[in-house]
Amino acid sequence: KVLLNQMPIAIKNSKIDITQEESTKELATNFAYYLKGGEIIFLYGEMGVGKTTFVRYLINEFQKKEKIPLTEVTSPTFNLLNEYRLNNLIIKHYDLFRLKHELEIKDLDIFENSKSSVTLIEWPQLINKEKLIKTIDLSFVYENELNNRTVKIKGLS
């Protein structure tokens, strides 16, 4: 279990078992209390490994904190972006699965980031991260012949 008071330690570099969906929810809940705005979270991993599930729990936890009704959170595969406006925070959820070239990313204004937003990006492989700050990488992985799932956390850079 990742405890709230351990979150900054977990952010540095750790691998967490999320085989049980409840563990994914707990991790997302902890992240919701850690993130303040301005962060960019890159979500890596195969289809179905838990990226969107993590995002759903994270956004719903932000909504609970702000006492906003929970909304359905789906992957923005076709429209590329779903935005969730909370009281003082905007969560931008991108899914870049369909993009094939780095040039397509420039039109999305992904990095028009501010301290009032948290940006979540699924399938970020085409992004050049060199000049970005406040990034967190979440790498979701199947293990033991697809029976288990883990997430490796790396950041803040």
Task: Indicate residue ranges for each PLM-predicted region.
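N-terminal pre-Walker A segment at the start of P-loop NTPase domains
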Residues: 8-28
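Hydrophobic anchor at the beta1->P-loop junction of P-loop NTPases
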Residues: 41-43
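P-loop (Walker A) phosphate-binding loop of NTP-binding proteins
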Residues: 46
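Conserved lysine of the Walker
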Residues: 51
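Post-Walker A helix-loop "phosphate-sensing" segment adjacent to the P-loop in P-loop NTPases
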Residues: 60-72
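AAA+/P-loop NTPase substrate/partner-engagement loops
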Residues: 73-91
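Short phosphate-coordinating micro-motif centered on Lys-Gly-acidic
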Residues: 101-105, 111-157
